[in-house]
Amino acid sequence: MIYYGTMFDHKVRFSIVRMREVVEEARNRHALSYLATVVLGRALIGAALVTPWLAEKERWTLDIEGNGPIRRVVAQSTSEFTVRGYVANPKVELPLNEKGKFDVAGAIGQGVLRVVRDLGLKTPFVSQVPLVSGEIAEDLAYYFAVSEQIPSAFSIGVLVDSDGVKIAGGFAVQIIDRTLEQEKVEMIEKNIKNLPSISKLFQEAEPLDVLERIFGEKVGFVETAEIKYKCDCNREKAKNALLVLDKKELEDMRKEGKGEVVCKWCNTRYVFSEEELEELLKFKVDDSGS
C-alpha cells in the first residue's frame, strides 16, 4: 500500500510505501538470490514511490547500469500504480559489506542511473546521472536534485532471509516550492536523519506514524493506492517477438519441435508448437514477396 499527499501548504509532497508482497512476487518470478532480491526490491520500491507524481498514462523507467556483477537493474512503474522489473544477473551473491548488510553498492558498482519518462509521445524524455553511491535511494535523490531540480530525500529498504522477503518499503519527501521556510527544511532534514533504517522503522511504526516523525506533526489528508506487480506481456506480443527473428532461426526452432519466448520483465514463458512455428514461417515467406 502506498500513502501520498502534501504538507505545509502543498510546498512539500511525500509518498510512503510498504510492498513486501510485491517484492516477494518479484523474487519468486525471477528466482532471485538474496542479494538480487534486495537490489531489484529497492529499485521497484523507488519506482513505486514516484507513481503518485506521474502524468496520466505515463510509464516511468529506472534503469541502472554498473560495472558490478549484477550489471543492470531495471524497474518500471505506471500511473496506474503498477510496477515490474528485472536484473541482468538474478543469481548474484557477494559477502556482506563492512556494516554486515547486503552489499548492494558492490553488486551494482560504478555506473549510471537513467530515467525514461514515456508520456505516450513520439520520443520519451531520457535523463542520465552518474551513480553517487550505488545504494539506489541516494542515487534517486541525486537524480531528482540534478535533473529535475527538486530537492529530495529517499529512504528504501528490503529485509530478506531464508523464508523470503520480510520487510520491503520506503519513503520519499520532495520540496516542490522553494518558498518553504528554512526552519521547516532543516526540521525535515533533521527528523529524517534521526530515523532508523527502513527495515527497523517498519518493524516499529506504521506509515502514518513515520510521516508524523518526519514532519513533526500529524499529516492531514492522505491518499492511498495498492501497488501491484503487473506486466503487460501476452502471447500476441511474444509471437511478434518471434517474427522479428530471421527465417533460419525460426526454421531451427521448428526442427527442434518448439519455440520459446521468455518475458524479461516477469519471466513468463510462452511456448509455441511446431505447427504454430510453421504458420509464422508462412508470414516470413509472404514478407519476402514470394
Swiss-Prot record:
Cited Gene3D superfamilies: Hsp33 domain, HSP33 redox switch-like
Major location (coarse): cytoplasm
Signal peptide: none
GO MF annotation terms: protein folding chaperone; unfolded protein binding
Post-translational modification: Under oxidizing conditions two disulfide bonds are formed involving the reactive cysteines. Under reducing conditions zinc is bound to the reactive cysteines and the protein is inactive.
GO cellular component, one term: cytoplasm
Record keywords, A-Z: Chaperone, Cytoplasm, Disulfide bond, Redox-active center, Zinc
Cysteine disulfide partners in this protein: C231-C233, C263-C266
Subcellular location: Cytoplasm
Gene Ontology terms describing biological process: protein refolding
Any matching Pfam family: HSP33
PANTHER family associated with the record: 33 KDA CHAPERONIN
Annotated function: Redox regulated molecular chaperone. Protects both thermally unfolding and oxidatively damaged proteins from irreversible aggregation. Plays an important role in the bacterial defense system toward oxidative stress.
Family per record: Belongs to the HSP33 family.
NCBIfam families named among the record's database cross-references: PRK00114.1 (NF001033)
Protein name, entry field: 33 kDa chaperonin
Organism annotation: Thermotoga maritima (strain ATCC 43589 / DSM 3109 / JCM 10099 / NBRC 100826 / MSB8)
